[in-house]
């Protein structure tokens, strides 16, 4: 039966990627997107060969297009190391495209698990998702560190641009070897982090928690706490109270303990390092990185970039290159499309598109809950003795989702 395609009013930016995720990306478009939607895609190839060919200019162009059109949907990409430089014959070791895009958009990355009833969780009490936001700027990730090989004084010096007066602190008097580190953050970046976090929690109608260690880092982490409170009081308190949700600051150790015993259903705003660590902890606790969404949200809440939380699945791609069968989990990549298109639908007030995205996500979960799943999920249920008849291959899973999506659309759409 022919479908009357849903018209997507405004464009979306598509960022193609690398390896096995590039393979499943095409399956997703051909089987789950194009048969149902009439949409204008602004396509950018962020595959590593094209980034190298364009001297990485394509990454910057992609970010600029995202700011123009407000919605981007990204396939997983390779961040090259020395081995990849040799493998692809690259001109240089290009930076992470995610980092470049994130810096241009000034956004916060929010990761959220996809929960299926029949997939066991290492933390069984997590019956609702925990959405974790990582402030991916500054701190240890832009720090300057050094090895000290001899006795001497370590000092921290600040020289104001418009003054000759220095502020100088003696950090430590070394009597022997050691290590040292200096790191920073900016009010502008922390404020953007606060706005993105407040917006995301409000959209979900979930409470928001910020975790820091301000009892130890009284000034540094205290600045995060103070700015979040300022933003909340100025822009969000009345909205949160009307929605029956709240914002609260917690110590990181208290927050980790709370997370372990909670049922989920909240947004957790983390500083850079905490978010790096805790997002993988949450992914494993819920079952799999293959079942994690990742959305970069800008401070105004208008511009987002959606992607899968995992990498390019190199090991499966090597099998695919040799003509072997793979069973690669495409759910997080499908959800990149659904979350991006859902945001497009909200910006455009497109009820038909929003309904389609909800049915697409429900089709994914319904397919898994009916017993059709890829090997990684079957292993979580059946363990190492999983049999071949207990999972489907890469394309079979997407075909099963497409069938389930059609069934759901037919049941509720009189145009079909």
Curated annotation (Swiss-Prot):
Q: Which subcellular locations apply to this protein? A: Peroxisome
Q: Name one GO cellular component term.
A: nucleus
The main enzyme category here is oxidoreductase
Q: Which Gene3D superfamilies match?
A: Isopropylmalate Dehydrogenase
Q: Which reaction does it catalyse?
A: D-threo-isocitrate + NADP(+) = 2-oxoglutarate + CO2 + NADPH
Positions annotated to bind NADP(+): 77-79, 84, 261, 311-316, 329
Its required cofactor(s), as named, are: Mg(2+); Mn(2+)
The annotation note on the cofactor reads:
Binds 1 Mg(2+) or Mn(2+) ion per subunit.
For this protein, the record's InterPro entries field holds: IsoCit/isopropylmalate_DH_CS, Isocitrate_DH_NADP, IsoPropMal-DH-like_dom
Give the GO terms filed under biological process for this record: isocitrate metabolic process; tricarboxylic acid cycle
Q: Name one GO molecular function term.
A: NAD binding
Function (record text): May be involved in response to oxidative stresses.
Which protein family is named in the record? Belongs to the isocitrate and isopropylmalate dehydrogenases family.
Q: What is this protein called?
A: Peroxisomal isocitrate dehydrogenase [NADP]
**Species, as recorded:** Arabidopsis thaliana
